[in-house]
Swiss-Prot record:
It catalyses: ATP + H2O + 4 H(+)(in) = ADP + phosphate + 5 H(+)(out). It comes from the Archaea. Belongs to the ATPase alpha/beta chains family. GO terms for cellular component: plasma membrane. Pfam families: ATP-synt_ab (PF00006), ATP-synt_ab_N (PF02874), ATP-synt_ab_Xtn (PF16886), ATP-synt_VA_C (PF22919). One of its GO terms (molecular function) is proton-transporting ATP synthase activity, rotational mechanism. It comes from Cenarchaeum symbiosum (strain A). InterPro entries: AAA+_ATPase, ATP-synt_VA_C, ATP-synth_a_Xtn, ATP_synth_asu-like_sf, ATPase_a/bsu_AS, ATPase_F1/V1/A1_a/bsu_N, ATPase_F1/V1/A1_a/bsu_N_sf, ATPase_F1/V1/A1_a/bsu_nucl-bd. Keywords: ATP synthesis, ATP-binding, Cell membrane, Hydrogen ion transport, Ion transport, Membrane, Nucleotide-binding, Translocase, Transport. This is A-type ATP synthase subunit A. It is a peripheral membrane protein. It is found in: Cell membrane.
């Protein structure tokens, strides 16, 4: 029996209704004559507190509230890829057809096109035993995505009694019948799943495979693993959104879920305009063919921001269960936390630090704990991952505020954006002294097996140079660079070269926007070798001025833009030229 009550109190997106004794926590309800979508977030006796996902303008006490009997759920099936949804999985294209440029209230529409036909290829036969997660067949969703039709995780399983033959079917067709205890349960191409409930998996693995983003400062110095968690905190204008766009564009994942949570609408427009024209570097297909957008911009209802995060991560888990690597980018979790703060204030809860609710930390933990690299349920055996990257927008760039400090407890990769670097035109403005990665030891084996055995040692040497330069900066500030010996002046010179030739990256340059792991390693190795050979040359009597005047320095700084990923021999030639020029300075062969 569904709950039926009446509105007694309205305060912004929060509504109180009585006569709701039949309602359940987190049940979806329709509110008012306009049938606005809402969710029960607190029950006191027969009074329900409801957060409404649409504008409550014009609602008045006495209007009806009706329960649906179901929690807030998303529809999972073919047709999700390439869509742009609002926070509760309503496709914005369909909403614009119904209500024009401004979204009307109380509009409901199907998240995917139920009449579109897909070519289904069955992978089980009549009489086969199936369990939750078993793949019964596949359809081609886009040129990049083979979509597995799976037995839902909450299904009882059983024996296949009937299955359709290969052919074209729409989403409402019964694809299979599964018999269990004398009952036949029909299975369609889609099913629904509650957004607040994590999807089940068989086994969770340690994150040992790096997520290659093509951004040198991330992949080389502060890597993130597939199935890992990362955060990009930064104040206004530090380049959070462009950095997240770069990760969404170039990360080596099969699916990208991009959640615009409370940010400017123009940023989502940028993604919509750019992605269809950009090609996936591995498949040469449009990036929109692997992307799902959840747009909940700053002028949309506040309550739907919270839902948008859960909607996005549930879609990500669904594709993970197919055995795909998924990257979920949330921009920004601070706006989500602000939505929690606003709802908490409306409900008159006791505020904690800076007005945020006391359960902020547990909500952040719930979100980040849904990341991971797993073996999916059922057969065939397949591994997938969900990597979560959240932007944090601390007001005034203050990293001690609650959202940043709580986020740091639950993530292992922290990319701290620095306003000073951004204002000096150093992008991505990731501060190499404040950032860290907890995945370095886990993924070093992959780099050793796939790129170079000495990758970790080379990376440590390069990072050591940057750390020493940071300590020397204080002396230089007080006494000037002339107070340093030549060996330390060389450290300053090589650190400057690393910042320009390695750490800086132009996301708008066709060559430099993406850097392959092999090119990253060779650029890194050349910088470290330049330093080692410089130290050796100084010991053998060479002048620092001669080292600074070497023509190869210009080549080292420009190699990131001049040499493409498929032109690795040119980098070897550059290393050879560096060798020869050092020989010319010292007059003897320098040991490598």
């Amino acid at each position: 029996m569904t709950a039926r009550g009446k509105i007694v109190w309205v305060s912004g997106p929060a509504v109180k209704a009585d006569g709701m004794s039949e309602a359940k926590m987190y049940e979806t309800v329709t509110v008012g004559e306009a049938r606005l979508i809402g969710e029960v977030i607190r029950l006191t006796g027969d009074v329900a507190f409801i957060q409404v996902y649409e504008s409550t303008s014009g609602l008045k006490p006495g209007e009806p509230v009706e329960g649906t009997g179901n929690p807030l759920s998303v529809l999972l099936g073919p047709g999700i890829i390439g869509q742009i949804y609002d926070g509760i999985q309503r496709p914005l294209k369909e909403l614009s057809k119904k209500s024009g440029s401004f979204i009307g209230r109380g509009i409901t529409t199907s998240p995917v096109d139920m009449t579109k036909k897909y070519h289904f290829v069955p992978s089980v036969s009549v009489g086969d035993d199936v369990i939750p997660g078993t793949v019964i067949g596949t359809v081609k969703e886009t040129d990049l995505i083979d979509h597995s039709i799976m037995v839902p995780p909450d299904h009882a399983g059983g024996k296949i009694k009937s299955i359709v033959s290969e052919g074209e079917y729409d989403l409402e067709t019964e694809m299979a019948g599964i018999e269990k205890d004398g009952k036949t349960i029909p299975l369609k191409m889609y099913h629904r799943w509650p957004v607040r409930q994590p999807r089940s998996y068989h086994t969770k693995y340690d994150p040992t495979v790096p997520l290659i983003t093509g951004q040198r400062v991330i992949d080389t110095f502060f890597p993130i693993a597939k199935g890992g968690t990362g955060s990009i905190p930064g104040g206004f204008g530090t380049g959070k959104t462009v950095t997240l766009h770069q990760i969404a564009k170039w990360a080596d994942s099969q699916v990208v879920v991009y959640i615009g949570c409370g940010e400017r609408g123009n940023e989502m427009t940028e993604v919509l305009v750019e992605f269809p024209h950009l090609k996936d570097p591995r498949t040469d297909k449009p990036l929109m063919d692997r992307t799902v957008l959840v747009a909940n911009t700053s002028n949309m209802p506040v309550a739907a921001r919270e839902a948008s995060i859960y909607t996005g991560v549930t879609i990500a888990e669904y594709y993970r269960d197919m055995g795909k690597d998924v990257v979920l980018v949330a921009d920004s979790t601070s706006r989500w936390a602000e939505a929690l703060r606003e709802m908490s204030g409306r409900l008159e809860e006791m505020p904690a630090e800076e007005g945020y609710p006391s359960y902020l930390a547990s909500r952040l933990a719930e979100f980040y704990e849904r990341a991971g690299r797993v073996r999916a349920l059922g057969s065939p055996e397949r591994n997938g991952s969900v990597t979560l990257v959240g932007a944090v927008s601390p007001s005034g760039g203050d990293f001690t505020e609650p959202v940043t400090t709580h986020t740091m407890r639950f993530i292992k990769t922290f990319w701290a954006l620095d306003a000073k670097l951004a204002y000096s035109r150093h992008y991505p403005s990731i501060n190499w002294m404040n950032s860290y990665s907890g995945y370095l030891a886990d993924i070093a084996k992959w780099w050793g097996e796939n790129v170079s055995k000495d990758w970790l040692d080379t990376r440590s040497e390069a990072y050591g140079i940057l750390q020493r330069e940071d300590t020397l900066k204080e002396i230089v500030r007080l006494l000037g660079p002339e107070a340093l010996p030549d060996e330390e002046k060389l450290i300053l010179e090589v650190a400057r070269m690393m910042k320009i030739g390695l750490l800086q990256q132009n996301s708008f340059d066709d060559v430099d926007t993406y850097c392959s792991p092999e090119k990253q390693y060779k650029l890194l190795k050349m910088q470290v070798d330049f330093y080692k050979r410089g130290q050796q040359a100084l010991k053998e009597g060479a002048e620092l001025a001669d080292i600074r005047a070497m023509p190869v320095i210009s080549g080292l700084l420009k190699a990131k833009m001049d040499i493409k990923d498929d032109e690795m021999p040119k980098l070897d030639e550059l290393a050879g030229a560096m060798d020869e020029q050092y020989k010319g300075i010292t007059g003897v062969k320098v040991a490598s």
